[in-house]
């Protein structure tokens, strides 16, 4: 592959592994698509470096579907920010490199990256070495030291829903949209889906078609299964979103939906607790089926003030915030 053609390189992963999932890759894909459009780039100008073996096969599956070029890291045991990883990344060069992962970059690693990459952007890095990057965005990892080049807070997120037109839906929104990320570690889709089905309600239940076999044939007839390509179309026409605390949750906030969240991992739990305190979401305790059932019944009977929740969401993350973040990223790319 001709390294001179690369304008932007992304280093991120997606995996059927707790704390990784698919959000980091989808966030990078969102940036890639928007920069491609803004700067009239081709897919040949954009390169992803991803792990592909074993549980990291999720990344390969997603990237191939999106038709971007990618380099495979075949050894899934290579550690983040190790000399081995640096050797692979520095086989290439580009105007900009974007690294998206929950980790801490070392000073040695980022300074040696500068030999091959003019500009560096970090997403959700937790180290003090973020100060050596041209831009660091921390929309979900918030307990970090502030630096001049770092923006910290939920409003600095990049979410895939920005790519999809928010067409006005004339019909009243209805139904529960269930989505627990690229890796539903705790099988919440099945557990919550079963609770909703037992309510025998008139409201629709929307679930991705790749989860169809989780449900018995007689239950499948009561669920509206959507294809992956219709994810955001279905999301827009849903009234309630039930999600984990990943990128899907932030899509729900920006889309101003009635949002019910169950944490899958520790960092998600922190954000969900914080957002609940700020009145932007409804938190669910997954182990208490009785309370979950009561919540759904109260929602359907309009006993919960959703307007207040939606007003609080607008202050936390909206599409103007996302557009401003993309302008910041574009400015880094353009700067000599």
Spans of model-derived segments:
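Active-site and donor-binding regions of nucleotide-sugar-utilizing enzymes
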Residues: 10-19, 27-38, 51-65, 69-146
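A donor-sugar binding/catalytic signature common to diverse glycosyltransferases
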Residues: 22, 229-271
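Short internal beta-strands
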Residues: 45-53, 205-210
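A nucleotide-sugar donor-handling region in carbohydrate enzymes
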Residues: 131-187
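Donor-nucleotide binding loops and adjacent catalytic segments primarily
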Residues: 174-239, 249
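Nucleotide-sugar donor-binding patch of glycosyltransferase catalytic domains
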Residues: 257-291
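Conserved donor-nucleotide binding/catalytic region of nucleotide-linked donor-dependent transferases
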Residues: 282, 287-316, 335
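C-terminal alpha-helical cap of glycosyltransferases
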Residues: 318-336
């Amino acid at each position: 592959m001709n390294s001179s053609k690369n304008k932007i390189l992304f280093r991120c992963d997606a995996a059927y592994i707790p704390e990784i999932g698919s959000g980091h890759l989808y966030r990078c894909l969102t940036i890639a698509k928007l920069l491609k459009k803004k700067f009239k780039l081709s897919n040949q100008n954009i390169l992803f470096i991803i792990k592909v073996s074993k549980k990291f096969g999720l990344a390969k599956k997603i990237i191939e579907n999106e038709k971007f070029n990618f380099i495979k890291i075949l050894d899934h045991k290579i550690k983040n920010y190790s000399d081995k990883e640096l050797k692979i990344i520095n086989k290439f060069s580009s105007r900009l490199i974007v690294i998206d992962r929950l980790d801490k970059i070392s000073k040695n690693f980022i300074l040696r990256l500068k030999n091959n990459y003019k500009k560096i952007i970090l997403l959700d890095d937790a180290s003090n070495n973020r100060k050596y990057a041209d831009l660091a965005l921390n929309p979900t990892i918030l307990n970090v030291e502030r630096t001049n080049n770092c923006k910290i807070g939920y409003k600095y997120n990049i979410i895939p829903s920005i790519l999809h037109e928010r067409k006005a839906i004339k019909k009243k929104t209805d139904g529960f949209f269930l989505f627990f990320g690229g890796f539903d570690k705790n099988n919440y889709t099945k557990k919550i889906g079963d609770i909703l089905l037992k309510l025998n309600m008139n409201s629709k239940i929307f679930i991705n078609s790749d989860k169809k076999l989780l449900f018995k044939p007689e239950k499948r007839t009561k669920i509206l299964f959507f294809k992956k390509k219709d994810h955001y179309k279905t999301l827009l026409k849903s009234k309630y979103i039930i999600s984990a605390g990943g990128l899907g949750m932030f899509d729900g906030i920006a889309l101003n939906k009635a949002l019910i969240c169950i944490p899958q991992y520790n960092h998600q739990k922190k954000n969900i607790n914080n957002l609940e305190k700020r009145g932007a979401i409804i938190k669910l305790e997954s182990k208490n089926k009785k309370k979950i059932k009561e919540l759904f019944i109260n929602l359907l009977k309009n006993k919960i003030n959703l307007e207040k929740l939606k007003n609080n969401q607008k202050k936390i993350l909206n599409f103007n915030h996302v557009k401003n973040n993309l302008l910041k990223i574009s400015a880094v790319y353009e700067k000599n």
